[in-house]
Regions:
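AMP-binding/adenylate-forming
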Residues: 1-37
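Gly/Ser/Thr-rich phosphate-binding loop
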Residues: 41-97
């Protein structure tokens, strides 16, 4: 803000950071929960839509939240970063013609995959050594990446590695009750995939 000559608008940290604002800032950084909360209040939603540059970080963006942001008139970005990188090191556009599933690293950032297909980051301006993450990723020909899940969320069932996040994403549109995917020991397959649901499953979901 100081480098760009911007005016800072201090707000009290909360789940509704826009509630006391009367005009939209040019730039804002929020977490997914704050964006979701703001969308539920008409006055806050109106301000949210007027933000010229909105970056969202600190956690994954749900597909429904992503869909709610696609028609925003100004630029909305998802950021990728962690404590070790001090700030975000890549951006992914969520709306407009440049919307993408892939993160584009900043020019000074180099990326590669480890032998376990986890993302490895080299940010020489921040750290001398490479940072090996637990995020299982895919890198395309344009040196962009997307996150498939966490290494510690992989189930090896019968020699087939299944990423929990991908299974949950596939099931989410079919299940209206809260649920999660986990695993259980199995004599034949070593591990089997288990669905834990809160409440009654729909009748058309086969239970075995």
């Amino acid at each position: 803000a100081l480098v760009a000559g911007l005016d800072l608008l201090p707000v009290t940290p909360s789940g509704h950071p826009l509630k006391d604002l009367t005009k939209a800032p040019v730039f804002a950084a929020m977490i997914p929960m704050q964006v979701y909360n703001s969308l539920q209040v008409p006055e806050e939603k109106a301000i949210l839509q007027q933000i010229r540059h909105l970056i969202i970080g600190g956690g994954p963006i749900d597909s429904q939240l992503n869909a709610a942001l696609k028609d925003f008139p100004h630029a909305v970005w998802s950021t990728y970063g962690m404590t070790e990188t001090l700030s975000h090191i890549a951006l992914r556009r969520l709306n407009g013609p440049e919307a993408s599933d892939w993160y584009t690293p900043f020019e000074s950032i180099q990326i590669r995959l480890s032998k376990e297909n986890t993302l490895v980051i080299y940010a020489p301006e921040i750290c001398e050594k490479e940072l090996v993450t637990n995020d299982i990723a895919e890198i395309n020909g344009q040196n962009q990446f997307r996150i498939l899940g966490r290494k510690d969320n992989t189930i090896n069932t019968g020699g087939v590695k299944v990423q929990i996040e991908q299974v949950e994403a596939a099931l989410k549109e079919h299940l209206s009750v809260p649920f999660l995917i986990t695993s259980a020991p199995d004599e034949k397959f070593g591990e089997i995939i288990v669905l834990l649901a809160e409440g009654q499953l729909p009748d058309d979901i086969e239970q075995t």
